[in-house]
Regions:
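Mature, structured domains of secreted/extracytosolic soluble proteins
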Residues: 6, 12-317
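Sec-dependent N-terminal signal peptides
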Residues: 1-5
Length: 317
């Protein structure tokens, strides 16, 4: 169910006697998102899931909401892939958060969507923050690299519905690295088959199990391109395994979900590869042991087991 930032509705008139917005009762939505789902045969499992998770009243509210609605086939695939015989086997807390991972505040028509990140109503287990969702519109519309829009722009009085062909499970930091083409070189580095460290396995660890949660300072493709020029080499294959392993560890903080607001000037940040220094005056930066400075260019991409900040220069040991 969808993306973007959760908004808080506030009264526009503090002087009203009844405390309701605009000085009077709000007319209930008459053709809600729930009404639309209830009237669609291929969304019957979604409706049952909303009932089990006690989200019917939420999505019958004023909104507006954007809902990514998985089809019955999508739900059946999700249940089979995760070893559940039926919807009743899914723990309520998990099901609720997965459903909220398909909901974004606001009415986002397909023409409003752009490639990038938005914020869902799902809450990360690594922090009190709502989780991000990655939208890619380069070839249709896809969410987190796994779920595509099959039918768009079904309008409701309290928002809009897009039917999707797969349940969007709760993302980990690897999910976003793989889904976002900005990090394709990073993914190629993390998955090089000669590495001693299984970075994908480590960074897929769920919160509650060491060494999660994680903070990942993720170099963009351009950052890796600049590194190759700096080192006068042709590609990642020219970096020996011990060096690449050490470089990648320098971008991972284990055991902490560090927001950009947690960074301060001259803050020592301990990564798996050693200490780096954060500064925030004039813009957030990271300085490695050689004095090389990397700018943090995108912040707070929140996953279920940690957080990602994009950087414009690779951090060296």
């Amino acid at each position: 169910i969808l993306l973007i930032s959760l908004t808080t509705l506030q009264s526009c008139n503090d002087d009203t006697d009844d405390g309701l917005p605009y000085g009077g009762p709000v007319e209930p939505a008459t053709n809600t998102i729930v009404d639309i789902a209830s009237g669609a045969e291929n969304l019957s499992i979604l409706v049952s899931a909303l009932e089990k998770s006690d989200l019917i009243s939420t999505l019958s509210g004023q909104g507006p909401f954007t809902v990514l609605a998985p089809s019955n086939e999508a739900f059946n695939t999700f249940l089979n892939d995760n070893g559940f015989n039926n919807l009743e086997d899914v723990p309520v807390d998990i099901l609720t958060n997965i459903l909220l991972n398909h909901v974004v505040g606001g009415r986002l028509a397909s023409t409003d969507l752009t490639t990038g990140y938005a914020t869902t109503f799902a809450i990360s287990s690594a922090s009190p923050a709502s989780m991000s969702i990655f939208i890619d519109i380069t070839n249709g519309v896809k969410f987190n690299g796994v779920s595509s829009v099959s039918t768009a722009d079904i309008s409701a009085d309290n928002g809009i519905v897009h039917l999707v062909d797969a349940v969007i499970e709760l993302p980990d930091v690897v999910t976003f690295a793989v889904a976002d083409p900005t990090f394709s070189t990073l993914v190629a580095a993390l998955t090089r088959d000669d590495l001693t460290t299984d970075f994908v396995g480590v960074l897929s660890t769920a919160t509650g199990t060491s060494p999660a949660p994680f903070t990942v300072f993720a170099p963009t493709n351009d950052a890796f391109g600049s590194l190759l020029s700096e080192l006068s080499i042709a590609g990642l294959a020219d970096i020996d395994e011990p060096t690449l392993d050490a470089v990648l560890k320098n971008h991972v903080v284990a055991g902490a979900n560090v927001f950009d607001t947690d960074l301060t000037d001259n803050l020592t940040v301990s990564t798996l590869g050693g200490d780096i220094t954060a500064n925030v005056t004039g813009g957030a930066t990271l300085t490695d042991s050689s004095g090389r400075v990397s700018d943090i260019i995108a912040t707070n991409i929140q996953a279920n087991n940690g957080i990602i900040h994009a950087i414009n220069k690779v951090i060296l040991p």
